């Protein structure tokens, strides 16, 4: 575990730290998909995958919110994979090394993968957080956003039941290597 696991909200940063340890280049999302499926199984969360490789997880609404409309939390599994010329790093097998520098979460010599690792972490945290009151939630994790939106365009019919979509986004620009802590 890296020092980012001490940040708040703790669950989000712990999940992001775990996600940074899983290789997830575009078109090679098998390991992160396995991570997501294992996560769903471990936490008894209903899940489904489609032929494209997308994953959807579903949790019911909390007490008093069961009949509210379902909200879809969307994020993507893959990341931009770039490294400094002097960095020995294999995006197919190496974990991202994170650190905090002057209030910023950064990666050591590579892109951070906050786009959209932090979106995945936030969605997973929302599914688990017992203090969060919510209607039914669906968390959609799509493949290959960075190089073609393959997962979004190939989403299996009937995968989603929600009527409202909360699209995950970050304030990072493409290829940026850090995220500021607010």
Language-model regions: role of each:
Residues 3-103:
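Acidic/His- and Gly-rich active-site-bordering loop/insert found
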Residues 11, 122, 170:
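Charged catalytic carboxylate motif
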Residues 30, 152-153, 177:
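Conserved strand-to-helix beginnings and helix N-cap segments that scaffold or border functional pockets
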Residues 53, 145-147, 172:
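Short beta->alpha connector loops
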Residues 65-136, 141, 146, 153-158, ...:
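Active-site metal-coordination/substrate-binding segment of hydrolases
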Residues 167:
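Phosphate/pyrophosphate-binding betaalpha-module
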Residues 170-177:
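Conserved small/polar residues in nucleotide/adenosyl-binding loops
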